[in-house]
Every structure is written in C-alpha cells, then in structure tokens.
Amino acid sequence: LTNNVSIENPKSLLAYGSRLYIVGNDFYSTDINSLQLLGQVGGFVNASHCAIIPQNRAFVSDRDESSVKLIDLNDYRIISEIETGENTSPSIIINKYDKSFVLNGGNNMNYDSTLVTITYKDDLIPLADFSGNLVIGKNPSSAVNSGNINVLCAGVYDESNPSDNIESSFYNIYPTDLLINFSQNLSGIYNANNLVETSNGNNYYFTANNGIYRTNTSMSNVNLVIPIQSDVLNITTEKYAVNDSTDAYSNFLYMNDLNNSGTLYKYNINLSSFVDTISVNGQIIDLAFKN
C-alpha cells in the first residue's frame, strides 16, 4: 500500500465504489485509486471474505470462529458477531434484498452443507440478525445473485483418497423464502468453485479439478472449455477490435494458472480464444475489477 503498510496473508478482494477492501489476517479499507490505507480492523482468527451492507457497515466471515463479524466502517471496529453454526467454516458472503447469504464452506476433512442468512435491515433500521438456514450440497464454494441465489458446491476432492470424493453440485434458491427452486449434480466434476455469469445472463463459467467449465443457467449443458487448472476466475466486459474499422464488445475471462505461478490469462468469450498473458511477481490469490 502507498503508506508503507504491508497486507499480512491476503486472501480476498472486494471493489466497492471508491474503495478496495482486502481481507487478510486483518480487514483493510483502501482507496481504490491510490491504494492508500484508510482503515484497518483486527480481531479475526481466520478471516476469509467480506461484503458491504447499508449504514456504512461490512460483514467479514471468520472461518475458524464459525462466525460473521460486523464492522462499523465509520470508526473501523467490530461491533457484533453472528454465529453461523458449529465448525461451519463460513466463507463467501453475497447480498440480496435485505439479507446477506453466507456459504458455510467446510473442507475435505469436515465438510458442511449449509447456507445461512443474516438480515441486515428492516426498512431503514440497521440490523445484523441470524434469520435462516438451508441445507444444500457438500462444501458450498461460490455464488452469484442474479435473479435467485445460485450456489456452486465444491463437493469433496482428495487426490490421495479418490474413493472419498463427492461430485460437485449446483443449487438455485429463492432468496425471499429460502427454498430450493432446483438443484443439479455435476457428473464427473469435482472441486467446483469461482462461479461467474456472463453479462447477458445466459451462461455460467466456473473452475473445477481439471479446468474451466461453461454451462447454461439450467445446468443442463455443462462442458469443459479451457483445460487449465485455476483457482482464480473473474469476468468483465471490454471492447476489442474486430478489424481496422470495427470494434465490438465481449465478455472476457481472467484466470490464473496453478501450474505457472504469477501467470494471468485473458480469454475473449466471443472469439473463444486467449488474447493476452499477464505476468506478475508472486502468487495470484484473487482478482477484482474497478467499476
């Protein structure tokens, strides 16, 4: 960071307005343009991800304490803590309507299969109340909130004990009443993660044990499209040159390569081809786009 502060053990990023939030051993708030540190909050055992909620507050999941901690972004302090269950390892947090949806991520040794909700407002009254619990697939790993809440579950993937493996799965959930609309096992796919959606809402992409997959939103046509092992994947829309006189817009995937540390690939979905390779010093842990 620009004011000589080191981020200890960075794990995830969230770009939100003029801020870039970084979760590491602590929670860090920075200016997205200058990367100047604006605030820092400690008090976590194993912080994982964050989400910004109304009234200038943030939720941060703490995997080892099986809780979500509420941060006041005015004075950068933890003001409450919401338990998510015993040994649940909460991770990803996404917002929809008046709630945050928390994925209890589990792991290969102690898997979890739950999604919990925390209601953060009632009209204009700020809240932070546990409000629901839903059993879904093994080890929920990522989600998008287009229309319903769409959750990808990693299953169990252990290369040294393949007999213990459990296939990944997908759940489409009504956000208002926390009921499952439909679910789908992903045959032959393990360790699915990093669910992203195209801008037209027609397709998802996600990472898995043997590469990056594309699917329609009903999960009825799932195909391996990029055979690169990756654990960082994000999507954005950019303009590109079709020829000397014509430009077009496409979704672009950005992904790391687990077999080539520090390598980031850029993939044009319209062209179904890689268009750039970016090299950085060090391991790529997460990727966020400035709005």
What role is predicted for each listed range?
Residues 7-16, 45-55, 86-95, 133-146, ...:
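Repeated scaffold domains used in trafficking and secretory/extracellular systems
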Residues 1-52:
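Post-signal peptide N-terminal segment of secreted/secretory-pathway proteins
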Residues 77-171:
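Solenoidal tandem-repeat scaffolds enriched in leucines and small polar residues
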Residues 28-29, 67-70, 109-117, 158-172, ...:
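Structural motif
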Residues 1-6, 34-42, 77-83, 122-133, ...:
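A short beta-strand motif characteristic of beta-propeller blades
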Residues 189-257:
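Loop/turn-rich, solvent-exposed surfaces of beta-rich toroidal or solenoidal domains
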Residues 14-26, 60-64, 102-110, 151-164, ...:
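Conserved beta-strand positions in repeat-built beta-propeller and related beta-rich domains
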Residues 258-291:
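Blade-level signature of beta-propeller repeat domains, shared across WD40, Kelch, NHL, RCC1
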